[in-house]
């Protein structure tokens, strides 16, 4: 998910409801570490639910060290509705099976190349980020292991990927 580029710092009081810690911040931060994301947990043994009096300085110091990733090379995005389908340079425009989320996992690789995997969608738009790709040169797009686009972007500066029957194509 896009949490890949969003650092998370959980603070939990050791005297707070222990069940919450076991179903909330503990498994969340474990999963973030498993995925290689930047997530950490600070358990304050003597604190209850309200940790602000003992955690503010450390939390602010941590927050001031974080940097926003303005141009992510990889985006994994899910949406239940097309109006919620845009994330950075990827947009889900059509959902094949309503009621189920559509998903796009797209990453920019060396050589002006984008590798994409899609689920439950029939139309995806890529808007190549000029900080990551040279839009004046050919851009290759591989979708589910097959080249579906290998050209320069048109005047719209976007690549539209559409699936008809079982075949994806790009323009």
What are these regions (language model features)?
Residues 3, 9-13:
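Short beta-strand/loop motif that positions the catalytic acidic residue
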Residues 1, 26-27:
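Alpha-helical scaffolding within the catalytic cores
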Residues 1-4, 34-35:
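Extracellular/periplasmic catalytic domains that process cell-envelope and extracellular macromolecules
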Residues 23-26, 57:
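A structural signal for well-ordered alpha-helical segments within the folded catalytic domains
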């Amino acid at each position: 998910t896009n949490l890949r580029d969003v650092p998370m710092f959980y603070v939990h009081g050791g005297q707070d409801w222990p069940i919450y810690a076991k179903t909330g911040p503990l498994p969340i931060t474990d999963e973030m570490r498993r995925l290689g994301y930047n997530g950490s947990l600070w358990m304050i043994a003597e604190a209850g639910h309200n940790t602000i009096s003992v955690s503010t300085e450390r939390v602010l110091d941590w927050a001031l060290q974080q940097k926003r990733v303005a141009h992510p090379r990889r985006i994994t995005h899910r949406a239940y509705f097309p109006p919620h389908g845009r994330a950075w340079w990827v947009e889900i425009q059509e959902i094949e099976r309503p009621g189920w989320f559509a998903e796009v996992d797209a990453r920019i690789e060396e050589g002006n190349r984008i590798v994409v995997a899609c689920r439950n969608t029939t139309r995806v738009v890529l808007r190549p980020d000029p900080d990551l790709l040279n839009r004046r040169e050919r851009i290759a797009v591989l979708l589910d292991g097959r080249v579906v686009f290998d050209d320069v972007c048109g005047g719209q500066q976007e690549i539209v990927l559409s699936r008809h029957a079982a075949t994806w194509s790009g323009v």
